C-alpha cells in the first residue's frame, strides 16, 4: 500500500485533486506530486455572477481559478477548469433561497459537498481514470474493515467534519484527505517551502456566493417576493411590531430584531405560513429533542438495528460548538436525537452531526438535517397555541 492506502507505487497511481485556488488544496496537490503520484488538478467554476465574483476570499471566483492555474504550472501538473455553474445554482443556490423563504437556516456548504464536489466531481474523477479524489478538507479517514471511516482532524480549530457529515460510505472509500493530520501553520509553511504563490492567501469564506455576507440580497434577487412583511409576535401572543421579511431573521437572534422591549428577547420561531417572527425569553430557546431528516448514518451496523433504548454518542448542532452527550433513536421510520444538555439557537435546516465521543480524534458517525426541534413543555404549549391564532 502507498501513502494513500492504495495498492501500487505512487508513480502508477492517478489522483485528481480538487483545487479551489486556496492554500490547502494547493498543498495537497504539491505533496502528492512530490511523492510521485500522477496528479490531475481540477478547479470548478461554481459561481461567477454579479458582485460575488469580486468578493475577496470567495471560493472558486475568477481570481481563485487563476491562482489554481498558477499553482498547477508551478508544480508541473495537469489542470482543468470545469464549468459547474448551472449545476451549482440548481443544487445549492436555489435550495438555499427556498429554505430561507420557508423559515429554515440552511447550510449551503453541506449541499455543495454532498451534490457538487463529492458527487459530480467524484464521477468526473472516475471518468478521468483516477484511483482517488483528494481534497484540502481538514478531516481524517482511515481503513475500517473493508471500508474507510471519517475522524476529526488533528487541527481542532480547522475541523470541517460538521460540513462533511453527508458524505456517503461509497464516497468516503474513494476520497482522500491528506491534511487531516496537519495543522494550518504547517500547511502554510509547506506552501512557502514549495514556492506556491498562495502561501499567504487568506482562507475562503464558507458561503462563497453571498456578497459581503448579505444573504438576504441573494435571496431577494432570486425570489423577488420573498421579503413579505409581517408581525413580530411575543410567544405569549402579543404583537410587538412589524418586520420586512422572515428571511432577515434566524433562530436565536437577539440583536437587530427591530423592537424595543423591557426584557431581552430572542427569535424563538419563524412562522413562514403566517409571515410571523416569534420572539421570547432565552429559556424558550432551550431544545432537548431534534427530529432529523435525510440522515446519513456511517456506523458499523444499519440504523434500523439501533438498540430499542437508543445509542449513546455525542452530537454537534453548530460548527463552532463542541460535541455534547446525546442519545440517537430510530423507530418506525423516524430518527431523532435526545440532547442530554439543552441547546439554544437550534434552527430547522441546520445539521446535527454525530460523533463517537468528544475527543479530538473522534469518529464521525454521520448525521442529519434538523426537521424540527422540541423545546421545554411550556414553550411548546405556547407555540402550539400561537399557531392557532390567525395572522
Swiss-Prot record:
Enzyme class of the recorded protein, top EC level: transferase
The EC number(s) this enzyme carries: 2.8.1.13
GO biological process, one term: tRNA wobble position uridine thiolation
Residues given in the record as ATP binding sites: 18-25, 44, 136
Keywords: ATP-binding, Cytoplasm, Disulfide bond, Nucleotide-binding, RNA-binding, Transferase, tRNA processing, tRNA-binding
Region (Interaction with tRNA): 158-160
Catalyzed reactions per annotation: S-sulfanyl-L-cysteinyl-[protein] + uridine(34) in tRNA + AH2 + ATP = 2-thiouridine(34) in tRNA + L-cysteinyl-[protein] + A + AMP + diphosphate + H(+)
Cystine pairs: 112-208
Similarity annotation: Belongs to the MnmA/TRMU family.
Name of the protein this chain belongs to: tRNA-specific 2-thiouridylase MnmA
Protein species of origin: Chelativorans sp. (strain BNC1)
Amino acid at each position: 500500500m502507498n501513502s494513500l492506502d492504495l495498492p501500487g507505487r505512487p508513480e502508477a497511481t492517478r489522483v485528481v485533486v480538487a483545487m479551489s485556488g486556496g492554500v490547502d488544496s494547493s498543498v495537497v496537490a504539491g505533496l502528492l506530486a512530490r511523492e510521485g503520484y500522477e496528479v490531475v488538478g481540477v478547479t470548478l467554476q461554481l459561481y461567477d455572477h454579479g458582485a460575488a465574483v469580486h468578493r475577496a476570499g470567495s471560493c472558486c471566483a475568477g481570481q481563485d481559478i487563476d491562482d489554481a492555474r498558477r499553482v498547477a504550472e508551478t508544480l508541473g501538473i495537469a489542470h482543468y477548469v470545469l464549468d459547474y455553474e448551472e449545476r451549482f445554482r440548481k443544487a445549492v443556490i436555489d435550495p438555499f433561497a427556498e429554505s430561507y423563504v420557508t423559515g429554515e437556516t440552511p447550510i449551503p456548504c453541506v449541499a455543495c459537498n454532498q451534490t457538487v464536489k463529492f458527487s459530480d466531481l467524484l464521477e468526473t474523477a472516475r471518468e478521468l481514470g483516477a484511483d482517488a479524489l483528494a481534497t484540502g478538507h481538514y478531516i481524517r479517514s482511515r481503513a475500517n474493515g473493508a471500508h474507510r471511516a471519517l475522524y476529526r482532524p488533528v487541527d481542532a480549530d480547522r475541523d470541517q467534519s460538521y460540513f462533511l457529515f453527508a458524505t456517503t460510505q461509497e464516497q468516503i472509500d474513494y476520497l482522500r484527505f491528506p491534511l487531516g493530520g496537519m495543522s494550518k501553520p504547517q500547511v502554510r509553511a509547506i506552501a512557502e517551502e514549495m514556492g506556491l504563490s498562495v502561501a499567504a492567501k487568506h482562507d475562503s469564506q464558507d458561503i462563497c456566493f453571498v456578497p459581503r455576507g448579505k444573504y438576504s440580497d441573494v435571496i431577494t434577487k432570486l425570489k423577488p417576493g420573498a421579503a413579505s412583511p409581517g408581525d413580530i409576535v411575543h410567544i405569549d401572543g402579543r404583537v410587538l411590531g412589524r418586520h420586512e421579511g422572515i428571511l432577515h431573521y434566524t433562530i436565536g437572534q437577539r440583536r437587530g430584531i427591530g423592537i424595543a422591549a423591557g426584557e431581552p428577547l430572542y427569535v424563538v420561531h419563524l412562522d413562514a405560513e403566517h409571515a410571523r417572527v416569534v420572539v421570547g425569553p432565552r429559556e424558550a430557546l432551550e431544545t432537548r429533542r431534534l427530529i432529523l431528516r435525510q440522515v446519513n448514518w456511517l456506523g458499523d451496523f444499519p440504523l434500523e438495528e439501533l438498540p430499542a433504548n437508543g445509542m449513546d454518542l455525542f452530537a454537534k448542532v453548530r460548527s463552532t460548538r463542541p460535541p455534547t452527550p446525546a442519545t440517537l433513536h430510530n423507530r418506525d421510520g423516524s430518527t431523532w436525537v435526545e440532547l442530554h444538555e439543552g441547546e439554544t439557537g437550534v434552527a430547522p435546516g441546520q445539521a446535527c452531526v454525530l460523533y463517537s465521543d468528544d475527543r479530538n480524534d473522534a469518529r464521525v458517525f454521520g448525521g442529519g438535517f434538523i426537521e424540527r426541534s422540541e423545546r421545554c413543555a411550556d414553550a411548546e404549549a405556547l407555540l402550539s397555541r400561537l399557531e392557532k391564532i390567525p395572522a
